[in-house]
Design a protein with these regions (language model features):
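Boundary at the C-terminal end of the N-terminal hydrophobic targeting segment
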Residues: 3-5, 10
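N-terminal mature ectodomain segment of secretory-pathway/periplasmic proteins
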Residues: 16, 21-74
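Solvent-exposed strand-loop boundary residues in beta-sheet-rich modules
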Residues: 39, 82-84, 161
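Beta-turn initiation residues at beta-strand->coil junctions
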Residues: 61-62, 81, 156-159
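Acidic/charged, solvent-exposed loop-and-adjacent secondary-structure segments enriched in E/D, K/R, S/T
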Residues: 78-105
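Anionic-ligand binding region
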Residues: 101-117
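Gly/Pro-enriched, hydrophobic low-complexity segments
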Residues: 112-198
Length: 199
């Protein structure tokens, strides 16, 4: 039996989520990432995310200032200003690892990607918990905090090493217009470019 059959209300909400993001052509939202591992203090970063289908993303960080992640549809570029280094990796090698935030690219299909899906009220929102169907992914559990109109406010990812990454989103705008140049990465003068090794 599908996990969806057990909770019709949650299933309906998740279909609303899928339609919201899968139908949008572009997206702009403020984001905050918080990474926690073991007994260490959480590490937080924040900024603005701009996205346009197919496969274009720009994560422009205000904290740490100057950090930039750009996906041009083929490669993912990450600039770390404190090291003046650019990491470049093919998109196909990075997309699976970030499957819990695949909704940003309009590729979220809960029933296909997740199992043991449950939903419970949290204030006026719904907290949806799930596990990946594939055992080959670097995370063991994910939680989505979803508003009544299908907007994802938070995504909590528990990785296999028990580290936790929480993405929070605010001031979401659907279908804004963007200049093409936002999604073309230009290597800063003097920066070292490190390319991921191909398997």
């Amino acid at each position: 039996m599908s996990a969806f059959a057990a909770d019709v209300q949650t299933a309906g909400l998740l279909k609303t989520v899928e339609q919201r993001y899968n139908r949008a052509d572009s997206l702009q939202v403020l984001f905050r990432e918080e990474y926690t591992r073991g007994g260490h203090a959480p590490r937080a970063e924040s900024g603005t995310l701009e996205l346009r289908k197919p496969g274009r993303m720009r994560w422009e960080y205000s904290d740490p200032k100057g950090k930039l992640v750009v996906c041009d549809g083929k490669n993912l570029w990450m600039y770390i200003p404190s090291e003046n280094r650019v990491d470049k990796s093919p998109l196909k090698e990075t997309d699976e690892a970030e499957a819990p935030i695949a909704f940003l690219l309009g590729k979220l299909h809960f029933e296909k990607e997740f199992r043991n899906i449950t939903g419970k009220p949290e204030g006026s929102d719904t907290l949806v918990a799930a596990e990946p169907k594939s055992d080959n992914l670097p995370y063991s559990a994910v939680e989505f905090l979803v508003t009544a109109d299908g907007r994802i406010r938070n995504v909590k990812v528990t990785r296999l090493d028990n580290s936790i990454m929480v993405y929070s989103f605010d001031q979401e705008k659907l279908n804004p217009r963007f200049d093409d140049k936002l999604f073309h990465f230009q290597v800063p003068t003097g920066a070292e470019v490190v390319e991921a090794e191909k398997n």
